[in-house]
Design a protein with these regions (language model features):
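Conserved helicase ATPase motor motifs in RecA-like P-loop NTPase domains
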Residues: 268-269, 373-377, 389-408
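ATP-dependent helicase/translocase motor core
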Residues: 2-292, 301-317, 334-337, 344, ...
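Catalytic cores and motor modules of nucleic-acid processing enzymes
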Residues: 15, 19, 54-55, 261, ...
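Conserved C-terminal RecA-like helicase domain
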Residues: 337, 466-590, 749, 753
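Short, conserved "post-DEAD/DEAH" coupling segment immediately C-terminal to helicase motif II
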Residues: 154-159, 376-394, 622-624
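Conserved RecA-like ASCE ATPase "motif II neighborhood" in helicase/translocase motors
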Residues: 338-385, 569, 573-574, 590-592
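Conserved RecA-like P-loop NTPase helicase motor core
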Residues: 344-345, 368, 529-668
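Interdomain helical connector at the RecA1-RecA2 junction of SF1/SF2 helicase-like NTPases
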Residues: 207, 407-496, 510-520
Length: 826
C-alpha cells in the first residue's frame, strides 16, 4: 500500500472528528473566520444576549477587546468574561468558554487561507465557540514530524494574527507519530516541549486516529485547555501539562474527594512534579468540601529555585518569612483556601497553645496536606505532630525516588508507611522513552593499579579508606582525567559540570590540585559546614576552606562575597552554573549540595568520586538529564569509584525492574558504549557517500528531493558524530575507513551552505520542500575557520577543471565570510 497523502490524512481526520461530535464548517479566509466567530458567540451567549444578536458596532467592540494581544494575553482573556454596555444601555457579560463541556460549540475546518507576510493555508483547525483553539498540521507518513513543527514556526512568524493568537494547543502528526504542545510568544518553538499523548498507564498513543479518539474527545480536550494549561506570567508563556501529569492530578483529586485516605505520586526526577503537585493543590482548593489546602515544603528547600518555580504558577504565593504568626493569619482568613508554607512553621503553629483557638476550628474539618519532594523534607519527623491536631486531614506526597524496603529511611519508614497508596507512576524508563528526560552515558574509570574488574568489590569497595582514596597519586590521576576530557564531555565547554566528592577534605584537595594546574577551566566549590566540627585528623577547618574558596571566587568572577553573605554566594553560583550569568562556571565541586533538587538544562556532566546508592545515586545522576537541545543527547556520568553494581540496582529499583534480567535487553536508561556509536557513524557515512560520493557532487544535486536526501543523511551523521566526540577514546583513525575528519568538515561546509541558502536566500514566495526540513543546526558544532583548514581547501582546488575550480573558489570565499579570524580577513 502506498503512502497516505496529506490531503487523504486531512479528510480522514475530519471525518473522524465529525463522528466525535464536531461540526464541519467551511472557512476560506480570515473574514469568514470572524463571521463564523460572531455567529457562534451569539449562539453560545444566547441567554446573556436575551436572544438579541450582537449588532455590527457591538461585535466590532468585541473584536477590539480580543485583537492586538500577545498569545499570553489572549490566553488570559480567553478565560475571562467580556463586559460592556450594549447600544440600548444594557450591561452584559459575554463568555468565551464554559467549563461544562456540553455547553460549548465544537467545530472543525480545514485549509483556512490567511495572507500575512506570505500567504499560508492551515491544515486542520478546531474551533470552540468560534475561536480557533487547536491547530493541527499534518505530514504524510514517512516525513519527519519535526517538519510540521517548523512549518508552524513559519506560520507564527508570517501570518498568525488576531483570533489565531487564541490558539492554545498545536498538534502535529504524520499519521503514525503524533505530538502536541502549547502555543507561545517565544521566537522559536522548542522541540523539547512537544509531547506524546498516552494512556493512564503511560502507553504512547501514536496513531492519529487513536490520538483523536482520546485527545479530541470533547470533554478531554476542554479539560486540557481549561484545567490543564498553566499561564506562566513570570516567563510570559503557556504551559500545557503532559499526560502523566494530568492523569496523576485526576487520580489524586478522585482519591481526595472519594476517600479519607492518603496517597502518593511516584514521578521520576526531572518530570515536572512541582507543577503536578501545584495543580493538584490549586484544583482541590476550589472544592467546597475541602476547607483548606496546605502545600508544604521544607525550610531548607525554600531556595531561589523553589521560589521561582512556585511564583510561575501563582505570583507572590510563597511566604518567605520565618514568622509562624504569618501562617496563622492566613489560616484565619476564610477566603484563603490554598496556603503555601513550610513544614516547620506548620508544626510550630500546631504546637503553640496561643494559636489553638484558630487552629481548633479546622480540627474536625476536611483539610489537605500536599508535600512536594516528600523525602527531601522533615515531614516524616513532624507528621505525627500535625496529624495529632487535624483529625480528618489527608496527606499526599510527591517523590521521584520512593523509599522501599531496600532503601527505607534512617528511622525504618517506607513511603507507603506515611502515604499508604501509590496513585500514579511515571518511572525513569517512561520518561526516557518519551524524551522527557535524557538517558545516561556512564563511564567507570580505573583509579587503582592492576587489573580492574567493575564487578569485583574487593578491588575498590573493599579498600574504601581515606588513605587510599585521597592518595596524591590518585588525586593527580582523577584531576588530570577531568581536565583532559572536560571539553569533549561538555561539547567544547558549551555545557557545565558538577564534581561530587566524598568529603570536605577531599573537595579541598581536588580544588587545590585543579587550581595548581592552571587550566583555563573556571571552577567553584560550595558546601555546608558545622561551626564546632572536630578537627582531629584534619589539616584545616571547613570554614577556613570555604573562606579561601570564596576569596578565589571573588577574584575569578569579580564579586565581593564572604562567609557572611553565603546565601548570595550560593545564588551567584546557581546563576553561573545555569549560564544565566556570565562568565559561567565550568565545574562546581560539591559534597552533598546541588545533588538533589537542582535543575539546570545547561548541566550535562557529573564527575563522581564518592559512594552513592539507591535514591542518592539516582538523584545525583539526574542533575544531568534535563532535556535541552540536540547537542545534549544524554547526561554524562564519569565514575571514579566502582558504582556499577549500585547503579544497576538503583536504576532497576526506580524503574520497577529490580528483578529484571537485562543481559539480552540493555536497559533504556543506559546509553550504548563507544563501539556502538563508532559503527553507527560508519554506517551513516557510507549512506551519505552513496548519495554524494564526493564533496563536489553535492553541488550537482539539482533537484530539491536530492538535496533533501543529502540534508537528512548528513544531519543524522552529524548527530552521531556529536555523540562520538563525547567519548574520551574517540579518534578519527577509528572511522577514517568510512570518512576522514577533513571529509566530514568538507561535507559539513556544503551542508551549511545549503542551510544558508534555504533560510536566507531562497525566494520566499516560492514553496519549497526544504522550507521546513529540520537541519538540527545546533549539533553542527561549527569550529572557527582557521588557516590550516583554508589551506587544505586551497590544496584541493581542481585546477584542471575550470568549472569545478570556480565552484571550489566560490566555496572558499563563503568559508572566509564565516570566519572571525583577522589573519584570514585581511
Amino acid at each position: 500500500m502506498g503512502y497516505q497523502s496529506e490531503a487523504e490524512l486531512e479528510n480522514k481526520l475530519i471525518e473522524k472528528l465529525k463522528t466525535q461530535g464536531y461540526e464541519r464548517v467551511l472557512i476560506n479566509d480570515y473574514a469568514e473566520l470572524e463571521n463564523n466567530f460572531r455567529e457562534q458567540l451569539n449562539k453560545f451567549n444566547i441567554i446573556a444576549l436575551e436572544n438579541k444578536p450582537l449588532t455590527d458596532k457591538e461585535f466590532e467592540r468585541v473584536l477590539n477587546v480580543l485583537n492586538g494581544k500577545s498569545v499570553l494575553q489572549s490566553a488570559i482573556k480567553l478565560r475571562e468574561k467580556i463586559d460592556f454596555d450594549r447600544e440600548d444601555g444594557t450591561k452584559i457579560y459575554l463568555k468565551l468558554l464554559s467549563e461544562n463541556a456540553e455547553d460549548n460549540i465544537y467545530q472543525v475546518s480545514n485549509q483556512i487561507t490567511v495572507q500575512g507576510k506570505y500567504k499560508n493555508r492551515y491544515d486542520v483547525t478546531i474551533l470552540i465557540n468560534g475561536l480557533p483553539l487547536v491547530q493541527i498540521e499534518l505530514k504524510r507518513s514517512g516525513i519527519d514530524i519535526n517538519e510540521a513543527i517548523n512549518q508552524i514556526d513559519r506560520y507564527r512568524i508570517h501570518s498568525y494574527r488576531g483570533l489565531f493568537h487564541y490558539i492554545q494547543i498545536y498538534v502535529v502528526s504524520n499519521s503514525v507519530e503524533t505530538r502536541y504542545f502549547a502555543n507561545t510568544d517565544a521566537q522559536r518553538l522548542l522541540k523539547s516541549l512537544t509531547f506524546y499523548w498516552t494512556t493512564e498507564t503511560n502507553e504512547r498513543i501514536n496513531k492519529l486516529e487513536d490520538f483523536s479518539s482520546s485527545f479530541f474527545n470533547k470533554a478531554r480536550l476542554l479539560k486540557n485547555v481549561i484545567r490543564y494549561m498553566v499561564i506562566n506570567e513570570t516567563d510570559k508563556n503557556l504551559i500545557v501539562m503532559r499526560p502523566y501529569q494530568i492523569y496523576a492530578t485526576e487520580a489524586l483529586i478522585r482519591h481526595a474527594l472519594d476517600t479519607g485516605k492518603n496517597g502518593y505520586i511516584w514521578h521520576t526526577t526531572g518530570s515536572g512534579k512541582t507543577l503536578t503537585s501545584w495543580k493538584c493543590a490549586n484544583l482541590l482548593s476550589k472544592e467546597q468540601s475541602i476547607k483548606k489546602v496546605f502545600f508544604l515544603i521544607d525550610r531548607k528547600d525554600l531556595d531561589i529555585q523553589t521560589k521561582e518555580e512556585f511564583n510561575k504558577f501563582e505570583k507572590d504565593c510563597v511566604d518567605e518569612t520565618d514568622k509562624t504568626e504569618t501562617l496563622v493569619k492566613q489560616i484565619k482568613d476564610i477566603d484563603r483556601k490554598l496556603i503555601v508554607t513550610t513544614i516547620q512553621k506548620m508544626a510550630n503553629a500546631v504546637k503553640n497553645p496561643k494559636y489553638s483557638k484558630i487552629l481548633d476550628k479546622y480540627k474536625e474539618e476536611k483539610v489537605i496536606f500536599i508535600i512536594d519532594e516528600c523525602h527531601r523534607s522533615q515531614f516524616g519527623e513532624m507528621h505525627t505532630t500535625i496529624k495529632h491536631h487535624f483529625k480528618r486531614a489527608q496527606y499526599f506526597g510527591f517523590t521521584g525516588t520512593p523509599r522501599f524496603e531496600e532503601n527505607k529511611s534512617q528511622n525504618g519508614l517506607k513511603t507507603s508507611d506515611l502515604f499508604e497508596k501509590c496513585l500514579h507512576t511515571y518511572l525513569i524508563k517512561n520518561a526516557i522513552y518519551d524524551h522527557n528526560v535524557l538517558g545516561f552515558s556512564i563511564e567507570y574509570i580505573q583509579t587503582f593499579k592492576g587489573q580492574y574488574d567493575e564487578n569485583d568489590k574487593t578491588m575498590v569497595e573493599g579498600i574504601d579508606t581515606d588513605e587510599v582514596y585521597m592518595a596524591d597519586e590518585r588525586i593527580d590521576l582523577v584531576t588530570n582525567h577531568i581536565i583532559n576530557n572536560h571539553k569533549c564531555k561538555t561539547v567544547n565547554g558549551k555545557y557545565t559540570a558538577i564534581f561530587a566528592t566524598s568529603s570536605i577534605p577531599a573537595l579541598a584537595k581536588y580544588y587545590d590540585k585543579i587550581k595548581s594546574l592552571n587550566s583555563d577551566l573556571k571552577i567553584a566549590a560550595v558546601f555546608s559546614y558545622g561551626e564546632n566540627e572536630d578537627l582531629e585528623g584534619k589539616d584545616e577547618h571547613s570554614k577556613d576552606i570555604l573562606a579561601r574558596i570564596i576569596d578565589d571566587y571573588n577574584k575569578e568572577f569579580d564579586t565581593n562575597f564572604s562567609l557572611e553573605t553565603f546565601a548570595a554566594y550560593n545564588k551567584d553560583i546557581t546563576n553561573r552554573l545555569k549560564i544565566k550569568k556570565s562568565p559561567k562556571i565550568d565545574i562546581l565541586l560539591v559534597v552533598n549540595m546541588y545533588l538533589t533538587g537542582f535543575d539546570s538544562r545547561p548541566l550535562n556532566t557529573l564527575y563522581v568520586d564518592k559512594n552513592l546508592e539507591w535514591h542518592n545515586l539516582v538523584q545525583a545522576f539526574s542533575r544531568t538529564n534535563r532535556v535541552e537541545m540536540a547537542s545534549k543527547p544524554f547526561g554524562n556520568i564519569i565514575c571514579y569509584r566502582n558504582l556499577k553494581s549500585n547503579t544497576d540496582k538503583a536504576l532497576r529499583l526506580f524503574s520497577n525492574e529490580l528483578e529484571a534480567n537485562t543481559d539480552n535487553n540493555p536497559p533504556i536508561w543506559i546509553i550504548p558504549g563507544y563501539g556502538y556509536f563508532r559503527d553507527k557513524f560508519k554506517e551513516l557515512a557510507f549512506k551519505l557517500l552513496s548519495i554524494a560520493p564526493t564533496v563536489q557532487s553535492v553541488d550537482d544535486l539539482m533537484s530539491e528531493d536530492a538535496q533533501r536526501e543529502f540534508v537528512i543523511a548528513f544531519r543524522e551523521l552529524s548527530k552521531i558524530k556529536s555523540i562520538l566526540t563525547t567519548f574520551s577514546e574517540f579518534s578519527w583513525a577509528d572511522v577514517e575507513d568510512a570518512l576522514t575528519c577533513q571529509g566530514y568538515e568538507d561535507y559539513k561546509s556544503r551542508y551549511l551552505t545549503l542551510y544558508d541558502f534555504v533560510k536566507k536566500e531562497r525566494n520566499a514566495e516560492k514553496v519549497s520542500i526544504l522550507d521546513d526540513i529540520d537541519f538540527a543546526i545546533e549539533v553542527i558544532q561549527t569550529d572557527k575557520i582557521n588557516v590550516t583548514y583554508i589551506m587544505n581547501l586551497l590544496r584541493n582546488v581542481d585546477t584542471a577543471n575550470k568549472k569545478q575550480q570556480a565552484k571550489d573558489l566560490e566555496h572558499i570565499k563563503q568559508e572566509l565570510d564565516r570566519t572571525d579570524n583577522p589573519e584570514l580577513r585581511r
